[in-house]
A protein has these predicted regions:
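Conserved protein kinase catalytic core
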Residues: 22, 38, 161, 186, ...
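Glycine-rich loop-to-alpha-helix module at the N-terminal edge of alpha/beta enzyme cores
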Residues: 37-126, 137
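Single conserved hydrophobic/aromatic residue that forms the stacking wall/gate
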Residues: 199-208
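Hydrophobic packing residues within well-ordered alpha-helices of enzyme cores
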Residues: 116, 189-192, 208
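Signature tryptophan residues that serve as conserved aromatic anchors
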Residues: 19, 61-64, 156
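Rossmann-like NAD(P) dinucleotide-binding subdomain of oxidoreductase/dehydrogenase enzymes
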Residues: 128-200
Length: 208
């Protein structure tokens, strides 16, 4: 597989800004569904790695939740732009591990970027409300706040767009994320993380 940006093909998990293996050293084979050829191996993560990812994401949440809606919007827009810039490579990775024709894979990459663009705009529209109170002289004020760490489990058949659809929504409102991609298609998820790690402040808030 020839990529313009070889740094997008990762064979380790992404936790707290670092590429790490499993504590046990165990790995899972990833196969090309067309040829059954082994593409590579990724860490077989256990409870300990999962707990570390969630704990680190919760630590990052304390800072991320304080960012303004505008700041989050700008970062998400840049993330979407970077995915579009790397669309050809991301499509190649998807095709070799998932089996979609290259044109269809690229279509999914662009669809995934459109989800990020959508939520980048929605980040600025998380409004509260004022509700009439049944008691005289009083009003009910509603505010919306980020809830914490969001776990995103994503399928093999849309290995890119379901990540961006879930994570962009969570990040837009100030939550941090931990992603569990399908074991058949981990490289698309890791490539999305690699894009954010290389160019954005997302390494502290997005884990795979």
């Amino acid at each position: 597989m020839e990529l313009n940006n070889k740094s997008l093909f990762k064979q380790k998990c992404f936790i707290n800004g670092e590429w790490v293996g499993s504590s046990s050293g165990e790995t899972l084979e990833v196969n090309n569904p067309a040829s059954l050829e082994i593409i590579g191996n990724v860490p077989k993560c256990s409870v300990s790695e999962t707990k570390k990812a969630v704990d680190d994401a919760n630590t990052a949440f304390q800072t991320w939740k304080e960012t303004t809606a505008k700041e989050r919007s700008v970062i998400l827009k840049k993330w979407g732009e970077l995915i579009i810039e790397n669309a050809d490579d991301l499509a190649k990775i998807m095709t070799i591990e998932q089996g979609k024709p290259l044109a269809e894979a690229k279509g999914e990459i662009l669809m995934g970027a459109s989800y990020i663009e959508f939520y980048a705009e929605e980040a600025k529209r998380v409004y509260g409300d004022i509700v009439p109170d049944p008691r005289p002289g009083k009003r009910i004020v509603i505010i919306k706040q980020p809830v914490g760490v969001v776990g995103a489990i994503t399928p093999w058949n849309f290995p890119n767009s379901m990540i961006t659809r879930k994570c962009a929504a969570a990040l837009a409102v100030g939550c941090t994320t931990v992603v569990k991609p399908a074991s058949q298609t981990p490289y698309s998820a890791l490539a999305v993380a690699a894009v954010s790690y290389t160019h954005l402040t997302l390494p502290t808030i997005d884990r795979v």
